[in-house]
Structures are given as structure tokens and as C-alpha cells.
Amino acid sequence: QRKDFCFKIVMEDEKGVIALELHTYNDYLRDLLKDAPCILAYDTAADYLGLSNGSSFHETAHIYVQSPLHIDGTTEHLIPSFSAVEHERRNGLLCTTVNQTINDLLRADGDNQVIQESLADVYFSNGESFDSLQIEQDLLPRFEKYKVWAMEYYDEE
């Protein structure tokens, strides 16, 4: 079972030529979930969207599902309908939007590093502003806490 960020495949053809292929985590997700009725969620969505630097070790891929799929290597989060979360098709897979991903990360209050990096990416990608986000009312106190760290995330001081 694949749990690292990327792996390399070395192949030799009939002429002895060696080829090197880089298989990224996003490639792995596309292979794993290409035909599955699911939406990438939480840390997995943040990685896939490029909001966080990712991790060199992925325990499982977090996905929203409407009914259990029992896919090895995933953690399934049941939702009544895909319309319950903001999502879009991105490079072949359904994934929560940036806004939904940020709200989900704040609600789960999971990996601080992923939350900080994701907020920092939004902040610096939008001209040092969080105006592109619509944070749910009950998550505003948590957002205020993380936002300060995110604004200073890339400072070298």
C-alpha cells in the first residue's frame, strides 16, 4: 500500500535504456479513485489543491462519499448528498473547493501545519488577503487564531 509522497519507477527496455518515472501523490489519488463516486476532502483535498506542502507520509486519503465504498487506503466521510459540500472537478477528480476545504480543516481542527499552510497559501495567493474565503460563523474564532499564524507563516524574521 502506497503511503509516501511520490515514488520512482525504473524500467529498462530491450536496448538497455533506463527510464525514470515520477508518480506523485496526486497521480496515486487519480489512479485509486478515478471511477469512484467520491469527493476529496480535508488534508487530502488541501494536498491535491496545492494549499499545503503535503506530507511525506499519508495515512489514508480522506474522501466524502454518499454510501460506503470500502476502498483500501481511504477514510470515508459519509454525507447525505454531494450537494452538501462545495466541490469542483479538478484534474480528473472531484475535490472540495478551496473555501470548503478551509472550512472543513478548521472544523476538524486537525493537523495545525496543514491548516496554517493552507491559510498562508490562500493569504499570499490573494494579495495578502483572506477576502476570497467565506468562513462559517461558528468557525470564526478558530479562523482568527490560525489567521495570525498564517499571515506570519512565510516571514523570515
Explain the meaning of each model-derived region.
Residues 1-89, 128:
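Short gly/ser-rich loop at a beta-strand->alpha-helix junction or flexible surface loop bordering the NTP-binding
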